[in-house]
Amino acid sequence: MARGNPRKRAAAAKDKWKMKEWYIVYAPDFFGSKEIGLTPADDPEKVIGRVIETTLKDLTGDFTKGHVKLYFQVYDVKGQNAYTKFKGHTLARSYIRSLVRRRTTRVDGIFNITTKDGYKLRVMGMVIAYRRIQTSQERAIRKIIQDIIYKKAEELNFADFVLQSVNGQIASEIAKEARKIYPIKRAEVRKIKVLAEPSA
């Protein structure tokens, strides 16, 4: 089947690209409304719904937070500015692999929670113990992860829960309690996913 003149196709593609404009993408207010990237589109409606990935290091300048990946979704465009809401976060796989070594125990917990202001989230907590631990100790540590995450959800609104998760405050509380059961290497809130926002 004929494909047409390659030069014409290239020229058409070039013209289409020229028609696109660049939109500046901003993080939500609770991340300081900082610029997190640029995205091109020939229609502002096409920008809405796009998901932008960045890291906590890029937002804060803290070089120890390069492994914390953040995801923001565009929900509104005004002029050349695109505004986002937080969709989730995760830790880089390479970072998690660096924590999980031979003869350690990884304790995971996955919980569906509702924040004080009605956001429904799926939260994954993780504790790494220095040695192989007993099943009873593993259960006790998982219960600690669960109790602290649920307690924080009851106390905090969505923005504060997210910030305390990504900056390590909730993980520090988990680590403090888990060490009463067994010496641990690290505690993390390794993933958050927004399941639903409160109805208007």
UniProtKB/Swiss-Prot annotation:
Coiled coil (residue ranges): none
GO molecular function, one term: structural constituent of ribosome
Keywords: Ribonucleoprotein, Ribosomal protein
Record-linked InterPro entries: Ribosomal_eS1, Ribosomal_eS1_arc, Ribosomal_eS1_CS
A Pfam family: Ribosomal_S3Ae
Keyword Membrane in annotation: no
Organism superkingdom: Archaea
Gene Ontology terms: biological process: translation
GO cellular component: cytosol; ribonucleoprotein complex; ribosome
Family, as annotated: Belongs to the eukaryotic ribosomal protein eS1 family.
Subunit architecture: Part of the 30S ribosomal subunit.
NCBIfam families xrefs: PRK04057.1 (NF003142)
Identification of the protein by name: Small ribosomal subunit protein eS1
